[in-house]
Amino acid sequence: MARTPTLSFDRGTLILHPPPKGKAWIEFATWDDRVERFRIPAIHYRELVEALQSDGTAFEDQARIFAPLPLVASVEMQPYPHQSEALAAWIEAGRQGVVVLPTAAGKTYLAQMAMQATPRHTLIVVPTLDLMHQWYAHLMAAFPDVEIGLLGGGSRDRTPILVSTYDSAAINAESLGNQYALLIFDECHHLPSDFNRVIAEFAIAPYRLGLTATPERADGRHADLETLVGPEVYRRTPEELSGTALANHEVVQIKVKLSAQERDRYDELIKTRNQFLQDVNIRLGSMQGWQRFVQASARSQAGRRAMLAHRESKEIALGTEGKLRVLADLLSQHYPERILIFTNDNATVYWISQNFLIPALTHQTPVKERHEILDRFRNGTYKTLVTSHVLNEGVDVPEASVAVILSGTGSQREFIQRLGRVLRRSKEGEKLAMLYEVVAEQTSEENTSDRRRSTTTPTTAKFKPKPAQQPRQLEIVPSNPTSSPYEISAHVTHRAADSPLQWGGDHPEAPET
């Protein structure tokens, strides 16, 4: 009597032995001479099982060790319409896919809703330790009766619900692959990298949810998300959620002219760079063009001079003195609102911190000090913070109403993340969130800004400095939230989730054999 085929999990792959009759499974399998067995990538587990079942093939499933997990939230909240719509779209797509929502639009609660609608062992993967601890705190509050653990930062738990960093999940992908039925990838644009993608490829999880504000990647690998997680099933922009889930907001572009000296030097540097690019037939504007420029700059003295000229021209555009005058004016206009200032480099962060007496946050700031600064910003002790990239992602930033981008990259993701830092609705009522993007006029930064703002419709303004004022003596002012040492401008332009629904059927059970 023929033995029943057995499907087993082996370090990120599946082994099906003895080979079953029929042909439905063959397209997934590759013969492995080392073990004399057919081997299938773990990521094809769901498709393989569905193919075997549709072919009427009997088999024993020893691959999965995940199990049902009763999830009852301690507090039920009424979801926003876009959260209910996103959950419904994800369920309709077979509980696989990517949801694109802006920062502060409630992606964490949407994930909780997905967990309640798919009550199985769940792995949540996040990019940073800060985010790992934020998710852990949220889930502990939501599901106090369920064992929740951490993987990363010294923790090595194995629990029904596990929160891990991408690094730790990738390192342990071979052992995690058959333990979880639902994978949730926060900031899922990190997943397609060579190192991280094994988390999805070595997992048999039939249910997958990707969350991000900006799935697009400069290297084009965001296309791999459809294979690793599923198709994009739902998307909303900040503009579509403005005034409902997010605060009303306005994006203002302020153009600053270079000084005569800066302009002459900038034009000279750009001429040097462009002449070299023309000589070697390289066009910037794409990842491939930039990579060719970097390679060519290492091959000759002319290439090195061109690269140095490019860097100096960028420094002039990003750090022109005119931007600092604009910053002083904006700080005056918006005092005592909470303001976040973003720059492209730490040197500018520290210069602004020292000259404007503003707390600074960079990757060099110790964790304890960073938490203390953010706590003081949250309780109003600090009204303003200046930072480079450390607050773009993975840090719980207290509510702010104004963001000033003095310099940035061409990344649409970075722009949307920075905008998201001021979009959280105020607990005190309606607010108008403002994002000012200060760019140097007639420079490459102006073109970069246009790419960054491709998803928004900003107001454009040319900066006009205030009339010169008489010098004022520095004086100590009392700690009064309504008074400002600057001149202030008079006018400044729970509902329970759906009932558990086999993958897409009435019950999210793995198929029984």
Please describe what each predicted stretch is.
Residues V386, E393-G408, E414, M434-E437:
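A short beta-strand element within the Helicase C-terminal
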Residues H133, E147-D157, R338-F342, A347-W351, ...:
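Conserved helicase ATPase core of P-loop NTP-dependent helicases/translocases
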Residues A93-M115:
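Walker A/P-loop
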Residues H190-N248:
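Post-DEXD/H (motif II) to motif III coupling segment of the RecA-like Helicase ATP-binding lobe
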Residues Q288-Q364, R370:
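Conserved helicase/translocase motor-coupling segment
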Residues M1-E85, S489-S499, D506, P511-T513:
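Accessory DNA-engaging acidic/polar modules
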Residues V422-S449:
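Conserved segment of the helicase C-terminal RecA-like domain
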Residues G152-L182, S193-V198:
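Conserved helix/coil segment N-terminal to the catalytic DExD/H
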